[in-house]
């Protein structure tokens, strides 16, 4: 399980996240802030627009139909995760791992999760430069890496 350390995602939802793997339906599961009926704190409009754009761009290159590529809540079968060499940190991680997973052609599920987004006054760190880095990583790991 990968979970951002800022607790915007609820650890009590691990059973929801890993259920498709435990039931032998999935190799990888993404928690989606944009699916399902779980509670979501309403925060920044432009973050949602940026996330939607990055997810769309990633989907174009990976041929996936994710709703939330940038989620910080993911689960993997051990063999899948161990086969990935991670190069990025910060906000380049999600586009990198999504591109590398897509090339492996595993069974991917998304599950609806809750989200308690933080404000900048509460320590939120992401900014426009992180979005630019994510775009760079989408191109880098989909076009120039095996």
Regions found by a protein language model. Give the residues of each.
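Short-chain dehydrogenase/reductase
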Residues: 94
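Secondary-structure boundary/capping motif
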Residues: 9, 77-80, 105-107, 137, ...
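Generic structural signal for secondary-structure transition and capping sites
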Residues: 26, 86-89, 106, 140, ...
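Short beta-strand-to-loop acidic/aromatic patch adjacent to the donor-nucleotide binding site
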Residues: 1-6
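Catalytic donor-sugar/metal-binding loop of nucleotide-sugar-dependent glycosyltransferases
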Residues: 64-65, 87-89, 98-116
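Basic/Trp-rich segment in TM-proximal cytosolic loops or flexible interdomain/linker regions
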Residues: 132-146
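Acceptor/aglycone-binding surface of glycosyltransferases and processive sugar-polymer synthases
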Residues: 11-91, 117-128, 132-135
């Amino acid at each position: 399980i990968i979970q951002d350390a800022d607790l915007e995602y609820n650890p009590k939802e691990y059973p929801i996240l890993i259920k498709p793997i435990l039931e032998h339906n999935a190799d990888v599961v993404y928690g989606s802030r944009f699916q399902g009926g779980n509670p979501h704190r309403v925060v920044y409009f432009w973050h949602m627009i940026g996330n939607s754009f990055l997810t769309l761009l990633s989907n174009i290159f990976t041929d996936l139909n994710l709703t939330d590529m940038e989620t910080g809540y993911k689960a993997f079968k051990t063999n899948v995760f161990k086969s990935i060499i991670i190069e990025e940190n910060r906000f380049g991680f999600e586009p990198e791992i999504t591109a590398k997973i897509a090339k492996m052609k595993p069974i991917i599920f998304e599950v609806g999760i809750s989200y308690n987004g933080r404000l900048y006054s509460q320590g939120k760190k992401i900014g426009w430069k992180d979005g630019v880095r994510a775009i760079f990583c989408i191109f880098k790991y989909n076009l120039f890496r095996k």
